[in-house]
Amino acid sequence: MVIRVYIASSSGSVAVKKRQQAIVGFLEANRISFEEVDITMLEDQRLWMYQKIPDEKRPEKGNPLPPQIFNGEDYCGDYEDFFQSKETNTVFSFLRLPSVKDSES
């Protein structure tokens, strides 16, 4: 399974850009393999992302904003979920990856 971070390269929102950069930077710094999927360039990927996000994670109005994180077809969460997992030191579990300890055994 591959981690996919759905981003919007042409977002006009500074907050969205900072959140995207925070996730990508963390994954790169921790050498976690991932793909960026730009939903502004790939209509089919944007629609796929929207369909796969659980109802309870959708906003009352409009569409979910990037960044959104998936492991293969499994939805992991959005920026808030990612941030919470960083704060509680559960990022590997959040991403549905074996922990560093598991891979060292």
Swiss-Prot record:
Coiled coil: none annotated. InterPro entries: Glut_rich_SH3-bd (IPR006993), SH3BGR (IPR051033), Thioredoxin-like_sf (IPR036249). Keywords: Nucleus, SH3-binding. A motif (SH3-binding) lies at residues 61-67. One of its GO terms (cellular component) is nucleus. It comes from the Eukaryota. Transmembrane segments: none annotated. It is found in: Nucleus. Gene3D superfamilies: Glutaredoxin (3.40.30.10). PANTHER family: SH3 DOMAIN-BINDING GLUTAMIC ACID-RICH-LIKE PROTEIN, SH3 DOMAIN-BINDING GLUTAMIC ACID-RICH-LIKE PROTEIN 2. This is SH3 domain-binding glutamic acid-rich-like protein 2. It comes from Danio rerio. The lineage of its organism: Eukaryota, Metazoa, Chordata, Craniata, Vertebrata.
